[in-house]
Amino acid sequence: MENESTGWNENKTSSNIKKHEGLSFEEAAEVFDDPFALEKYDDKNSTIDEARYIVIGRIKRQIVTLVVYTPRNEKKRIISARYSTTNERKAYYERLRRIISKV
Protein backbone atom coordinates (compact mmCIF):
# COMPACT_ATOMS: atom_id res chain seq x y z
CA MET A 1 0.00 0.00 0.00
CA GLU A 2 1.21 3.50 -0.68
CA ASN A 3 0.27 7.11 -0.82
CA GLU A 4 2.12 9.91 -2.59
CA SER A 5 5.06 10.06 -0.18
CA THR A 6 4.84 6.93 1.96
CA GLY A 7 4.77 3.18 1.35
CA TRP A 8 4.52 -0.04 3.34
CA ASN A 9 3.89 -3.75 3.08
CA GLU A 10 0.26 -4.70 3.78
CA ASN A 11 1.23 -7.97 5.51
CA LYS A 12 3.61 -6.05 7.75
CA THR A 13 0.95 -3.48 8.68
CA SER A 14 -1.43 -6.32 9.61
CA SER A 15 1.13 -7.78 12.01
CA ASN A 16 1.88 -4.28 13.34
CA ILE A 17 -1.83 -3.79 14.13
CA LYS A 18 -1.83 -6.98 16.20
CA LYS A 19 1.48 -6.24 17.91
CA HIS A 20 1.05 -2.53 18.64
CA GLU A 21 -2.46 -1.90 19.97
CA GLY A 22 -4.21 -1.52 16.63
CA LEU A 23 -1.81 1.00 15.09
CA SER A 24 -1.80 0.68 11.29
CA PHE A 25 0.92 2.05 9.04
CA GLU A 26 -1.69 4.18 7.30
CA GLU A 27 -2.45 5.93 10.61
CA ALA A 28 1.23 6.08 11.57
CA ALA A 29 2.10 7.81 8.29
CA GLU A 30 0.41 10.92 9.70
CA VAL A 31 3.56 11.42 11.78
CA PHE A 32 5.26 12.76 8.64
CA ASP A 33 2.73 15.63 8.57
CA ASP A 34 3.75 16.84 12.04
CA PRO A 35 5.95 19.93 11.53
CA PHE A 36 7.42 19.45 15.02
CA ALA A 37 8.33 15.76 14.66
CA LEU A 38 11.73 14.63 15.90
CA GLU A 39 13.69 12.72 13.28
CA LYS A 40 17.07 11.02 13.61
CA TYR A 41 19.24 8.52 11.81
CA ASP A 42 18.99 5.04 13.35
CA ASP A 43 22.65 4.05 13.78
CA LYS A 44 21.79 0.83 15.57
CA ASN A 45 19.58 -0.68 12.86
CA SER A 46 20.90 0.87 9.65
CA THR A 47 23.12 -1.17 7.36
CA ILE A 48 25.32 -0.38 4.39
CA ASP A 49 22.43 -1.38 2.12
CA GLU A 50 19.58 0.27 4.05
CA ALA A 51 19.53 3.50 6.03
CA ARG A 52 16.85 3.68 8.69
CA TYR A 53 15.36 6.68 10.43
CA ILE A 54 13.28 7.12 13.57
CA VAL A 55 10.54 9.75 13.72
CA ILE A 56 8.64 10.72 16.85
CA GLY A 57 5.62 12.91 16.26
CA ARG A 58 1.90 13.32 16.66
CA ILE A 59 -0.89 11.59 14.80
CA LYS A 60 -4.58 12.45 15.13
CA ARG A 61 -3.35 15.79 16.49
CA GLN A 62 -2.45 14.38 19.89
CA ILE A 63 -1.10 10.83 20.01
CA VAL A 64 2.69 10.77 20.04
CA THR A 65 3.92 7.88 17.91
CA LEU A 66 7.29 6.42 16.89
CA VAL A 67 7.82 5.33 13.28
CA VAL A 68 10.84 3.61 11.76
CA TYR A 69 11.26 4.06 8.02
CA THR A 70 13.75 3.69 5.20
CA PRO A 71 13.96 5.89 2.11
CA ARG A 72 13.04 3.83 -0.94
CA ASN A 73 12.20 5.00 -4.46
CA GLU A 74 11.80 8.60 -3.29
CA LYS A 75 9.26 7.54 -0.64
CA LYS A 76 9.40 6.83 3.08
CA ARG A 77 8.79 3.10 3.45
CA ILE A 78 7.47 2.35 6.94
CA ILE A 79 9.13 -0.60 8.63
CA SER A 80 7.58 -0.37 12.09
CA ALA A 81 5.30 1.88 14.13
CA ARG A 82 4.19 1.99 17.74
CA TYR A 83 2.85 4.36 20.32
CA SER A 84 5.65 6.24 22.03
CA THR A 85 7.06 5.50 25.47
CA THR A 86 6.90 7.98 28.34
CA ASN A 87 10.51 9.06 27.69
CA GLU A 88 9.86 9.53 23.96
CA ARG A 89 6.80 11.68 24.67
CA LYS A 90 8.81 13.69 27.16
CA ALA A 91 11.56 14.34 24.56
CA TYR A 92 8.95 15.33 21.98
CA TYR A 93 7.17 17.79 24.26
CA GLU A 94 10.42 19.25 25.62
CA ARG A 95 11.50 20.00 22.06
CA LEU A 96 8.09 21.46 21.27
CA ARG A 97 8.32 23.76 24.33
CA ARG A 98 11.76 24.97 23.18
CA ILE A 99 10.43 25.73 19.71
CA ILE A 100 7.39 27.57 21.05
CA SER A 101 9.45 29.60 23.53
CA LYS A 102 11.50 31.00 20.62
CA VAL A 103 8.39 32.41 18.94
Go through each PLM region and give its residues.
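Ribonuclease/tRNase effector modules and their secretory precursors
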Residues: 1-103
